[in-house]
Amino acid sequence: MILPIVAIVGRPNVGKSTLFNRLVGRRKAIVDDMPGVTRDRNYETVTRFDVPFILIDTGGFEPESSDRLLQQMREQSRLAMEEADVILFLMDGRAGLNPADVEVVEMLRRVDKPVFFVVNKVDGETLEVAASEFYSLGVDNLLTISAEHNRGVRDLMDEVVAALPQRTTSPEERNATKIAVVGRPNVGKSSLVNRLLGYERVVANPTPGTTRDSVDTWFTCNKKRYLLIDTAGIRRKGKTTQKIEKYSVVDSLRSIERADVVLIVLNAEEGVTEQDERIAGYAFEAGKACIFVVNKWDAIEKDNSSVGRFVDKIRTEFKYLAFVPIVFVSAKTGQRLNRIMEEVEKVMAQYVKRVTTSELNRIFSAAVESHHHPLVMGRRVKFYFATQVGTRPPTFVIFTNRPDGMHFSYERYLVNKFREAFDFTGTPLRLLFRGRER
């Protein structure tokens, strides 16, 4: 299912980030060595009333002058108008109505999609009265909230969720292995997809996907059905660098949410960038099976240690993805392209793997006996048993007397023991700790 996008726009300091954080909620950091994943994020998948959508905070600019401010607001609103399914235009109830707000409101009146005009920082009756000037705008869907104090936010989200487009997943898509090809612009995603489909000698049946020209292509490999989600078509003429950078990440995010296996495409000529780290981090956080595909390998000068050096670079930059296989290819020459589908089948098998409870507890008991959890508030942590409760990714529940006291390093230790014992290549593992009365 393609997730709808909700964009928050508005001047600096009107509370966009506060509302964004309020809707996203607090999220546990996965590990400390994950640059770009939990820091400086301005997009997130949110679920409200069992409805998932992608939320974007389009802010973060500090212009030098009022003219520059208006220019930034116009550009920001244009991005939202083109890319989002629902727009939240935030204004400051304390500061009052601003001429720049008025101009953007006039622009948003002409948009043929749901727009909510939201007056923020309305914390009490006095400010409610002061905010009445915003009603002079004469717009529908004008709501007052306090993102900081959670006032009116639920009512706002009731309206937003009701306005989201309804999308469904076909039975064919549910039963197929879905592969997302993601990466920043110019890493060679489009060429890679074309080569991959050509190599498999299939007749592609492209289906328009999102408004950013993503394309879904069905194909068959080794008598198995696959859906290839290609996000390569996002760079179009007349689009700004800001849009390319922001929405290439968002488009990848949408594809990742739909996928089982994510091909994270890197450019061998340019190495690993912060945006690569961001996209890979989201794939891991979303619980997807992953493969690193280093493209344009033909374009660099090589010696006997070139592969080893690049592998070391990836392992250094993506310490938390040490379980992800790496394939070096050239979309231009077709070099090693057959390895991609081989790895897809391998990691997919691990992604849906189930292990028996007896085997799991044999490994679990040995791991606990070999290395005890540190004391929590002076008390010993006891473990009772483990069981697998799900796949995509493999998910395990561990029963203990201190489910709230688990140290992240011990959780990582158990994950590594499970991975080593059961060969969970290419897939993240999820551990859930629950209490049990004795």
From Swiss-Prot:
Residues covered by the EngA-type G domain: 4-168, 177-352
Protein name (record): GTPase Der
Highest taxon above the source species: Bacteria
Source organism: Geobacter sulfurreducens (strain ATCC 51573 / DSM 12127 / PCA)
Domain KH-like: 353-437
GO molecular function terms listed in the Swiss-Prot or TrEMBL record: GTP binding; ribosome binding
Similarity comment text for this entry: Belongs to the TRAFAC class TrmE-Era-EngA-EngB-Septin-like GTPase superfamily. EngA (Der) GTPase family.
Annotated GTP 1 binding sites: 10-17, 57-61, 120-123
Parts forming coiled coils: none
One BP annotation, GO: ribosome biogenesis
Function text: GTPase that plays an essential role in the late steps of ribosome biogenesis.
Keywords from the named record: GTP-binding, Nucleotide-binding, Repeat, Ribosome biogenesis
Subunit comment: Associates with the 50S ribosomal subunit.
Gene that encodes the chain: der
